[in-house]
Amino acid sequence: MVTLRNTKEEDLEYVLGAEYKASVDAYVINWSEEKHLGAIEDKLVDHKIIESEGRSIGYLIANRNPDDNYELMRIVVSEKGKGYGKEAIKLLLKFAFEEISTHRFWLDVRMHNTYAIRLYENLGFKEEGILRECVKYKDGYVSVKVMSILRREYEI
């Protein structure tokens, strides 16, 4: 069973380590400890630890805005292939649509992260477009796909 809880300052060592491992494959860009602390303190940002059986297995960061949009800014799961990411996103979708009255839940995902793209599609996310070569990585650039799910699509 997967649960989400608010990230605490003492979780940052885990968060930074998990993030570094994910950055090697260009799935996320490393944030500084200060940037994570700012996100933890920001009332419009949900910085959560993903847990299973009392163990930290990942983290996610989502951002609220005044137009009732909710952006999944990043999700990092340390233990891949066990369904933890899918369960965490389902919990976040439930929170967004049922507790804080989100209209649109959106994210962007690197085009080479085909596993994540399939997961989002299976959860009902629709492609909105491609931002071509918009993220610098090593000596080149990677493209990202913007995806979203609307409240009416979630409720079906």
Task: Go through the PLM ranges and name each one.
Residues 107-117, 134-140:
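Conserved beta-strand-loop-alpha-helix junction that forms the acyl-donor binding cleft
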Residues 6-10, 16-80, 95, 99, ...:
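Acetyl-CoA-dependent GNAT
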Residues 51, 131-132:
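Core beta-strand residues in small-molecule sensory/regulatory alpha/beta domains
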Residues 99-108:
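Conserved GNAT acetyl-CoA-binding A-motif
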Residues 120, 125, 147:
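Conserved active-site tyrosine of GNAT-family acetyltransferases
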Residues 82-96, 117-122:
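Conserved acetyl-CoA-binding loop-helix of GNAT-fold acetyltransferases
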Residues 140-156:
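Terminal substrate-recognition subdomain of acyl/acetyltransferases
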